Swiss-Prot record:
UniProt keyword list: Isomerase, tRNA processing
Originating species: Leifsonia xyli subsp. xyli (strain CTCB07)
One protein family per Pfam: TruB_C
GO function term, MF aspect, one: tRNA pseudouridine(55) synthase activity
Annotated family: Belongs to the pseudouridine synthase TruB family. Type 1 subfamily.
EC assignment: 5.4.99.25
Function: Responsible for synthesis of pseudouridine from uracil-55 in the psi GC loop of transfer RNAs.
InterPro entries (UniProt xref): PsdUridine_synth_cat_dom_sf, PsdUridine_synth_N, PUA-like_sf, PUA_sf, tRNA_psdUridine_synth_fam2_C, tRNA_psdUridine_synth_TruB, TruB_C
Annotated active site: 42
Lineage: Bacteria, Bacillati, Actinomycetota, Actinomycetes, Micrococcales
GO biological process: mRNA pseudouridine synthesis; tRNA pseudouridine synthesis
Reactions catalysed: uridine(55) in tRNA = pseudouridine(55) in tRNA
Protein name, per record: tRNA pseudouridine synthase B
Length: 302
């Protein structure tokens, strides 16, 4: 194991970096190979990337599916091959067509893409098609058509609008379920308005309860100082159960707990905390019995 303990790091990813670039940098800085992330950000995007270090990579499973918040710029007036600014332009709208797009039409288009919707992911995405990433198939020259899937856009707000002759830039804020593509929202809004659209800029501002304002810049990152210890991380994600010494020992050895008085959630993870304050593991209650979902090595936990 490296010099650093187990926990989460909140990184403010710079533009131009892949999520894997960030993981590779943190591996070097932290001196451990055991680094993973809770959801990819496109290279063009900036903002919050949640990393797990050492045994806390096991927590990432429970963060990947969390609600996300973004701010971004949707550019109306052109459709692109990737649904973002990095793709080749497929078609441009005439200035007259753009000028005819009413603010009320934009509001109606946004409303139609809010709530529980069926969304077709961008062809240049990390969605797997027969075991191979869609973007890899596109780069190999294949035609990729992905099926629509259900996503939830719980908020889609227009923050500001800027009109030019060849484009309308919409600054937006989106709160959505995991698996929602903001690029696809840009594409679909442009298509609804008949002028084409793509994503010109994107910043992820929140993942679950973690806000980008708590995130650290890579350029000045000191992993040990920035680390959210595993116990603190799990306590902010889940309900907590304080164990006795005997219960902590039993759980660490894989035994099930029998707790008649538990009144917390059932069928979802609970953070099991030892009397010392360290995280023993994640457990799940079924009836009066608790089974271990994830164990955490005692020597790693801060």
């Amino acid at each position: 194991m490296g010099m650093i303990g187990s926990g989460l790091l909140l990184i403010d990813k710079p533009g131009g970096w892949t999520s894997h670039d960030v993981v590779a940098r943190v591996r070097r800085l932290a001196g451990t190979r055991k680094v993973g992330h809770a959801g990819t950000l496109d290279p063009m995007a900036t903002g919050l990337l949640v990393l797990g270090l050492n045994s806390s990579t096991r927590l990432l499973t429970y963060i990947v599916g969390a609600e996300k918040e973004y701010v971004g710029t949707i550019r109306l007036g052109a459709a692109t091959t990737t649904d973002d600014i990095e793709g080749e332009i497929l078609e441009r709208a005439e200035p007259a067509a753009l000028a005819a797009v009413a603010e009320s039409s934009i509001a109606e288009g946004i409303a139609a893409l809010t709530g529980e919707i069926e969304q077709v992911p961008s062809a240049v995405s990390a969605v797997k098609v027969d075991g191979k990433r869609a973007y890899a198939r596109v780069r190999a020259g294949e035609e990729v058509v992905l099926p629509a899937r259900a996503v939830t856009v719980s908020a889609f707000r227009l923050l500001s609008e800027r009109r030019e002759q060849d484009a309308i830039d919409l600054e937006v804020r989106v709160v959505c379920s995991s698996g929602t593509y903001i690029r696809s929202l840009a594409r679909d809004l442009g298509a609804r308005l008949g002028v084409g659209g793509h994503l010109a800029a994107l910043r992820r501002t929140r993942v679950g309860g973690y806000d980008v304002r708590r995130a650290h810049e890579l350029a000045t990152l000191e992993p040990a100082a920035a680390l959210i210890p595993a116990t603190e991380a799990a306590s902010s994600l889940f309900e907590r159960l304080r164990l006795t010494e005997q219960q902590a020992t039993d759980l660490a050895h894989g035994k099930r707990l029998h707790l008649a008085g538990w009144e917390g959630p059932r069928g979802e993870p609970v953070a099991a905390i030892a009397p010392s304050g360290s995280l023993v593991g994640l457990i799940e209650f079924r009836g009066k019995e608790a089974r271990t979902l994830v164990n955490f090595p005692a020597d790693e936990i801060a």
